[in-house]
Design a protein with these regions (language model features):
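Exposed beta-strand/loop interface patches that mediate assembly or binding
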Residues: 1-90
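Low-complexity, small-hydrophobic/phenylalanine-enriched stretches
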Residues: 41, 78, 87-88, 93-132, ...
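Extracellular disulfide-bonded cysteine-rich modules/repeats
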Residues: 42-46, 138-144
Length: 144
């Protein structure tokens, strides 16, 4: 891939083909519910229906530079070039934020129907004068 346009209804890409042939505005068909904007250098499988080289269609775009390795049979992952991923492992779901925040938005609530464990602090009202659970325990313990 040499270029990408994610604004159109059907994403299009600029591609350099095997013999160095360049193609612009090649439609990239994506599976329903999934979309991505691949980095330059990603690889594509392009079909030319009826052998018509004037209208290619990229049916698969992959980038082996960033592909997660070592998945067990049956495991599935969603990933990017920054180390962020969601992996459906045989033991459970693993979300790797790649060192960035994980933000949930536009929901009426978050409900967890299981025990919650944290190795870090839990803070309430984090955008105002919230306190961590540890700070609240210190305040509470001082009253007893």
């Amino acid at each position: 891939m040499t270029a990408i346009d994610t604004v159109r209804k059907c994403q299009t890409a600029g591609l350099k083909l095997i013999a160095g042939e360049k193609k612009e505005n090649v439609e990239h068909l994506e599976p329903y519910g999934f979309t991505s904007a691949a980095q330059n250098g990603a690889e594509a499988v392009v079909l030319f229906p009826g052998g018509d080289r004037s209208h290619g269609v990229a049916v698969v775009v992959a980038d082996r530079r960033f592909r997660l390795k070592g998945l067990a049979r049956g495991e599935v992952a969603l990933y990017d070039d920054q180390g962020q991923s969601v992996t459906l492992t045989r033991a459970g779901i693993v979300i790797n934020g790649g060192g960035k925040p994980v933000i949930f938005t536009n929901a009426t609530k978050a409900r967890f129907e299981m025990p919650i464990e944290s190795t870090g602090d839990i803070r309430d009202n984090c955008d105002s004068s919230g306190k961590t659970m540890a700070e609240m325990r210190t305040t509470y313990n001082g009253h007893t």
